[in-house]
Regions:
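Short beta-strand-to-loop acidic/aromatic patch adjacent to the donor-nucleotide binding site
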Residues: 59-70
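Short coil/turn segments at secondary-structure boundaries
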Residues: 12-13, 76-77, 141-142
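Conserved beta-strand termini and adjacent loop/short-helix elements that scaffold enzyme active sites
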Residues: 32-34, 95, 179-182
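Structural recognition of the beta-strand scaffold that forms the well-ordered cores
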Residues: 30-31, 63, 91-95, 127-129
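Catalytic core and acceptor-binding pocket of nucleotide-sugar-dependent glycosyltransferases
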Residues: 48, 120-218
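Short catalytic/ligand-binding loop motif for oxyanion handling, primarily in non-cytosolic enzymes
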Residues: 39, 71-74, 79-81, 101-104, ...
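N-terminal anchoring/stem segment of glycosyltransferases
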Residues: 1-60, 170-171, 194-203
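Conserved donor-nucleotide/metal-binding helix-loop-beta segment in metal-dependent transferases, i.e.
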Residues: 71-120
Protein backbone atom coordinates (compact mmCIF):
# COMPACT_ATOMS: atom_id res chain seq x y z
CA UNK A 1 0.00 0.00 0.00
CA UNK A 2 1.14 3.50 -0.82
CA UNK A 3 -0.40 6.04 1.56
CA UNK A 4 1.01 9.39 2.59
CA UNK A 5 0.45 10.78 6.12
CA UNK A 6 -2.36 13.09 4.99
CA UNK A 7 -4.54 9.99 4.56
CA UNK A 8 -4.14 8.88 8.18
CA UNK A 9 -7.75 9.89 8.87
CA UNK A 10 -8.87 6.62 7.25
CA UNK A 11 -5.71 4.54 6.95
CA UNK A 12 -5.82 4.30 10.75
CA UNK A 13 -8.58 1.78 9.98
CA UNK A 14 -7.48 0.39 6.62
CA UNK A 15 -3.88 -0.46 7.51
CA UNK A 16 -4.46 -2.51 10.68
CA UNK A 17 -7.29 -4.36 8.94
CA UNK A 18 -5.04 -5.26 6.00
CA UNK A 19 -2.27 -6.18 8.43
CA UNK A 20 -4.57 -8.61 10.23
CA UNK A 21 -5.77 -10.06 6.93
CA UNK A 22 -2.16 -10.65 5.91
CA UNK A 23 -1.26 -12.16 9.27
CA UNK A 24 -4.26 -14.50 9.01
CA UNK A 25 -2.97 -15.87 5.70
CA UNK A 26 0.79 -15.65 6.49
CA UNK A 27 1.39 -12.85 3.98
CA UNK A 28 3.67 -9.84 4.39
CA UNK A 29 2.23 -6.32 4.46
CA UNK A 30 4.22 -3.27 3.33
CA UNK A 31 3.28 0.38 3.68
CA UNK A 32 5.05 3.07 1.63
CA UNK A 33 4.52 6.58 2.99
CA UNK A 34 6.92 8.88 1.13
CA UNK A 35 6.36 10.48 -2.26
CA UNK A 36 9.04 9.90 -4.88
CA UNK A 37 8.36 13.03 -6.92
CA UNK A 38 7.79 16.71 -6.30
CA UNK A 39 6.59 17.43 -9.85
CA UNK A 40 4.16 14.54 -10.39
CA UNK A 41 0.80 13.60 -8.91
CA UNK A 42 0.94 11.08 -6.05
CA UNK A 43 -0.59 8.36 -8.22
CA UNK A 44 2.77 8.12 -9.95
CA UNK A 45 4.55 7.65 -6.64
CA UNK A 46 2.20 4.74 -6.05
CA UNK A 47 3.23 3.16 -9.35
CA UNK A 48 6.87 3.82 -8.49
CA UNK A 49 6.45 2.10 -5.10
CA UNK A 50 5.17 -1.03 -6.86
CA UNK A 51 8.05 -0.97 -9.31
CA UNK A 52 10.61 -0.59 -6.52
CA UNK A 53 9.03 -3.42 -4.54
CA UNK A 54 9.14 -5.78 -7.51
CA UNK A 55 12.84 -5.16 -7.98
CA UNK A 56 13.78 -5.25 -4.30
CA UNK A 57 11.83 -8.33 -3.16
CA UNK A 58 11.79 -11.92 -4.37
CA UNK A 59 8.09 -12.58 -3.79
CA UNK A 60 6.26 -14.70 -6.36
CA UNK A 61 3.17 -12.48 -6.30
CA UNK A 62 2.36 -8.97 -5.17
CA UNK A 63 -1.00 -7.37 -4.41
CA UNK A 64 -1.12 -3.57 -4.46
CA UNK A 65 -4.17 -2.01 -2.82
CA UNK A 66 -5.08 1.65 -2.56
CA UNK A 67 -5.30 3.37 0.79
CA UNK A 68 -9.07 3.67 0.40
CA UNK A 69 -9.60 -0.10 0.37
CA UNK A 70 -10.37 -2.27 3.38
CA UNK A 71 -10.93 -6.03 3.73
CA UNK A 72 -14.54 -7.04 4.27
CA UNK A 73 -13.66 -10.49 5.62
CA UNK A 74 -10.59 -12.67 6.07
CA UNK A 75 -12.04 -15.76 4.37
CA UNK A 76 -10.99 -15.34 0.74
CA UNK A 77 -7.29 -15.97 0.16
CA UNK A 78 -5.04 -14.58 -2.55
CA UNK A 79 -4.36 -18.14 -3.67
CA UNK A 80 -8.07 -18.63 -4.38
CA UNK A 81 -8.17 -15.44 -6.44
CA UNK A 82 -5.09 -16.51 -8.40
CA UNK A 83 -6.58 -19.93 -9.06
CA UNK A 84 -9.79 -18.37 -10.35
CA UNK A 85 -8.47 -15.50 -12.46
CA UNK A 86 -4.71 -15.76 -13.12
CA UNK A 87 -4.96 -18.04 -16.14
CA UNK A 88 -1.83 -19.30 -17.85
CA UNK A 89 -1.52 -16.33 -20.23
CA UNK A 90 -2.13 -13.58 -17.64
CA UNK A 91 0.55 -11.78 -15.64
CA UNK A 92 -1.40 -8.92 -14.02
CA UNK A 93 -4.95 -8.73 -12.68
CA UNK A 94 -6.77 -5.43 -12.20
CA UNK A 95 -9.98 -4.56 -10.44
CA UNK A 96 -12.70 -3.77 -12.96
CA UNK A 97 -13.46 -0.05 -12.83
CA UNK A 98 -17.18 -0.66 -12.80
CA UNK A 99 -20.02 -2.40 -11.00
CA UNK A 100 -22.62 -5.04 -11.68
CA UNK A 101 -26.11 -3.58 -11.58
CA UNK A 102 -29.13 -5.83 -11.13
CA UNK A 103 -26.57 -8.61 -10.58
CA UNK A 104 -25.86 -9.32 -14.25
CA UNK A 105 -25.57 -5.90 -15.89
CA UNK A 106 -22.05 -4.47 -15.79
CA UNK A 107 -21.45 -0.75 -16.24
CA UNK A 108 -18.11 1.09 -16.13
CA UNK A 109 -17.85 3.90 -13.61
CA UNK A 110 -16.20 6.19 -16.16
CA UNK A 111 -18.59 6.07 -19.12
CA UNK A 112 -16.77 8.92 -20.87
CA UNK A 113 -13.47 7.02 -20.84
CA UNK A 114 -15.21 3.78 -21.82
CA UNK A 115 -16.83 5.31 -24.91
CA UNK A 116 -13.75 7.28 -25.95
CA UNK A 117 -11.45 4.28 -25.61
CA UNK A 118 -14.08 1.85 -26.93
CA UNK A 119 -13.51 -0.38 -23.92
CA UNK A 120 -16.43 -1.45 -21.78
CA UNK A 121 -14.16 -3.06 -19.18
CA UNK A 122 -11.65 -0.57 -17.80
CA UNK A 123 -8.84 -1.23 -15.30
CA UNK A 124 -8.90 0.29 -11.83
CA UNK A 125 -5.33 0.91 -10.71
CA UNK A 126 -6.34 0.79 -7.04
CA UNK A 127 -6.20 -3.00 -6.90
CA UNK A 128 -3.50 -4.83 -8.85
CA UNK A 129 -2.53 -8.47 -8.30
CA UNK A 130 0.58 -9.42 -10.23
CA UNK A 131 3.32 -11.94 -10.74
CA UNK A 132 6.86 -10.85 -9.92
CA UNK A 133 8.72 -11.61 -13.13
CA UNK A 134 10.59 -9.81 -15.89
CA UNK A 135 7.46 -9.17 -17.97
CA UNK A 136 5.67 -7.44 -15.09
CA UNK A 137 8.77 -5.42 -14.20
CA UNK A 138 8.99 -4.26 -17.81
CA UNK A 139 5.28 -3.37 -17.67
CA UNK A 140 5.83 -1.09 -14.68
CA UNK A 141 9.01 0.36 -16.20
CA UNK A 142 7.03 1.41 -19.25
CA UNK A 143 4.01 2.62 -17.27
CA UNK A 144 6.21 4.82 -15.11
CA UNK A 145 8.14 6.16 -18.11
CA UNK A 146 4.87 7.54 -19.50
CA UNK A 147 4.50 9.70 -16.37
CA UNK A 148 7.08 12.10 -17.82
CA UNK A 149 6.10 11.91 -21.48
CA UNK A 150 2.39 11.27 -21.91
CA UNK A 151 -0.18 14.07 -22.26
CA UNK A 152 -2.57 11.80 -20.34
CA UNK A 153 -0.27 11.63 -17.31
CA UNK A 154 -1.60 14.89 -15.91
CA UNK A 155 -5.29 14.38 -16.77
CA UNK A 156 -7.40 12.50 -14.24
CA UNK A 157 -7.60 9.56 -14.00
CA UNK A 158 -3.91 9.94 -14.78
CA UNK A 159 -2.28 6.54 -14.57
CA UNK A 160 -5.45 4.80 -15.75
CA UNK A 161 -5.70 6.98 -18.87
CA UNK A 162 -2.07 6.19 -19.71
CA UNK A 163 -2.82 2.53 -19.18
CA UNK A 164 -5.90 2.58 -21.41
CA UNK A 165 -4.69 4.82 -24.24
CA UNK A 166 -0.98 4.05 -24.44
CA UNK A 167 -0.41 0.57 -23.02
CA UNK A 168 -3.47 -1.63 -23.49
CA UNK A 169 -3.43 -0.63 -27.16
CA UNK A 170 -0.33 -2.84 -27.45
CA UNK A 171 -1.32 -6.43 -28.15
CA UNK A 172 1.36 -8.03 -26.00
CA UNK A 173 0.37 -5.90 -23.02
CA UNK A 174 -3.35 -6.39 -23.50
CA UNK A 175 -2.80 -10.15 -23.61
CA UNK A 176 -0.99 -10.21 -20.27
CA UNK A 177 -3.66 -8.20 -18.43
CA UNK A 178 -6.71 -9.77 -16.83
CA UNK A 179 -9.40 -8.74 -14.37
CA UNK A 180 -10.90 -10.02 -11.15
CA UNK A 181 -14.67 -10.06 -11.07
CA UNK A 182 -16.58 -7.42 -9.17
CA UNK A 183 -17.60 -9.91 -6.48
CA UNK A 184 -13.97 -9.86 -5.31
CA UNK A 185 -13.59 -6.09 -4.96
CA UNK A 186 -15.86 -3.16 -5.77
CA UNK A 187 -17.03 0.12 -4.31
CA UNK A 188 -19.95 -1.52 -2.52
CA UNK A 189 -18.86 -4.73 -0.76
CA UNK A 190 -16.60 -7.28 -2.41
CA UNK A 191 -15.92 -10.67 -0.89
CA UNK A 192 -12.28 -9.68 -0.34
CA UNK A 193 -12.45 -5.92 0.10
CA UNK A 194 -14.34 -2.71 -0.48
CA UNK A 195 -12.84 0.09 -2.55
CA UNK A 196 -14.39 3.43 -1.68
CA UNK A 197 -14.60 6.14 -4.32
CA UNK A 198 -16.01 9.63 -4.82
CA UNK A 199 -16.05 10.34 -1.10
CA UNK A 200 -14.23 12.71 1.22
CA UNK A 201 -11.54 11.35 3.58
CA UNK A 202 -13.90 11.89 6.49
CA UNK A 203 -16.68 9.95 4.77
CA UNK A 204 -14.30 7.10 3.99
CA UNK A 205 -13.15 7.03 7.62
CA UNK A 206 -16.74 6.87 8.84
CA UNK A 207 -17.49 3.93 6.54
CA UNK A 208 -14.29 2.07 7.39
CA UNK A 209 -14.54 2.39 11.16
CA UNK A 210 -17.32 -0.20 11.71
CA UNK A 211 -15.54 -2.71 9.42
CA UNK A 212 -12.32 -2.17 11.37
CA UNK A 213 -14.14 -2.65 14.67
CA UNK A 214 -15.77 -5.85 13.48
CA UNK A 215 -12.65 -7.45 12.03
CA UNK A 216 -9.83 -6.09 14.18
CA UNK A 217 -11.21 -5.04 17.56
CA UNK A 218 -13.71 -7.84 18.15
Amino acid sequence: MFATPNLDVYTQYAIPTWEKYCATHSYHFFHYRDAYYDDLHLVWSKIRSVREHLYEHDCDYLLMVDADTIPTSFELSIEEILSEFMTHDKQILFQKDGSNRLRYLYFPHNLKLAFRSKRWILPNAGFILMKNNDAVKAFFDEWLAHAHSSPYATQAPRNQQVLVYEMLTQTQIENMVGYVETWVVNKFKGKLCQHFSSKTPEQIAALMQPIYRELVIR
